[in-house]
């Protein structure tokens, strides 16, 4: 049977977190630098452990004002220290509740820049390796972060997005531009199935692009996020695709 990991970014102030955890297999928990705080980290961790969901850290640039979406050009050593700090904080909270971290997925601008900026990607990968080399790294499919993680001997999962538009080079269409978000649920469902079953995605230009899908991100924000997540989960099941972490 084909299997895929479904992940969601949580602990960011949305009301859907507990319900989404019943639908996904991996949770990326905000570490306080773009959203969340120690209380949301503890609560989201407790919910994830209760559901048996794999837990990951979701570090970002220090940018609460713009939800971690502001591009920053910081020295690699500063990024290394910041990522290490955020992973360590969440790991302590998870361990105190009897769990353990399984992966790290950067957030927002840090994620997108690391997909194309090798020094930044290496700084993130080094932080993960130096904290715990057994942790996996989630990065944009085909991006520099995936390559950097593997170069350092880490497990890397190539991530795709159910509801984001793609450019012909496999990168995500920038937020705020036409085609960045797939508003039509059927289109997003079709895109997800194509990525998981056929390992390809159709770009906004109509070009089919090869893509490796090892984990699919479902966004938890938005009025219809929970209903859409249920549809994705149901459709995968009806197609004989199992949902599990480590798939």
Curated annotation (Swiss-Prot):
<keyword id="KW-0547">Nucleotide-binding</keyword>
<dbReference type="GO" id="GO:0005524">
    <property type="term" value="F:ATP binding"/>
</dbReference>
<keyword id="KW-0378">Hydrolase</keyword>
<dbReference type="GO" id="GO:0017168">
    <property type="term" value="F:5-oxoprolinase (ATP-hydrolyzing) activity"/>
</dbReference>
<protein>
    <recommendedName>
        <fullName>5-oxoprolinase subunit A 1</fullName>
        <ecNumber>3.5.2.9</ecNumber>
    </recommendedName>
</protein>
<dbReference type="InterPro" id="IPR005501">
    <property type="entry name" value="LamB/YcsF/PxpA-like"/>
</dbReference>
<dbReference type="InterPro" id="IPR011330">
    <property type="entry name" value="Glyco_hydro/deAcase_b/a-brl"/>
</dbReference>
<dbReference type="Pfam" id="PF03746">
    <property type="entry name" value="LamB_YcsF"/>
</dbReference>
<dbReference type="GO" id="GO:0005975">
    <property type="term" value="P:carbohydrate metabolic process"/>
</dbReference>
<comment type="similarity">
    <text>Belongs to the LamB/PxpA family.</text>
</comment>
<keyword id="KW-0067">ATP-binding</keyword>
<comment type="subunit">
    <text>Forms a complex composed of PxpA, PxpB and PxpC.</text>
</comment>
<comment type="function">
    <text>Catalyzes the cleavage of 5-oxoproline to form L-glutamate coupled to the hydrolysis of ATP to ADP and inorganic phosphate.</text>
</comment>
